């Protein structure tokens, strides 16, 4: 249903965002 689909999309998006932030922080060190 809509809710579980949007939740899955959000967790995927959050995972990608976290990954980008971590690699950005690593690059600045």
From Swiss-Prot:
Keyword Lipid metabolism: yes
Keyword Iron-sulfur: no
Subcellular location per the Swiss-Prot or TrEMBL entry: Secreted
A molecular function GO annotation: phospholipase binding
Record keywords, A-Z: Chylomicron, HDL, LDL, Lipid degradation, Lipid metabolism, Lipid transport, Secreted, Transport, VLDL
Gene Ontology CC terms: chylomicron; high-density lipoprotein particle; low-density lipoprotein particle; very-low-density lipoprotein particle
GO biological processes: lipid catabolic process; lipid transport; positive regulation of phospholipid catabolic process
Function: Component of chylomicrons, very low-density lipoproteins (VLDL), low-density lipoproteins (LDL), and high-density lipoproteins (HDL) in plasma. Plays an important role in lipoprotein metabolism as an activator of lipoprotein lipase.
Family: Belongs to the apolipoprotein C2 family.
Name of protein: Apolipoprotein C-II
Originating organism: Ateles geoffroyi (Black-handed spider monkey)
């Amino acid at each position: 249903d809509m809710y579980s689909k949007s939740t899955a999309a959000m967790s995927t998006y959050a995972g990608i965002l976290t990954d980008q932030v971590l690699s950005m922080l690593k690059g600045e060190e």
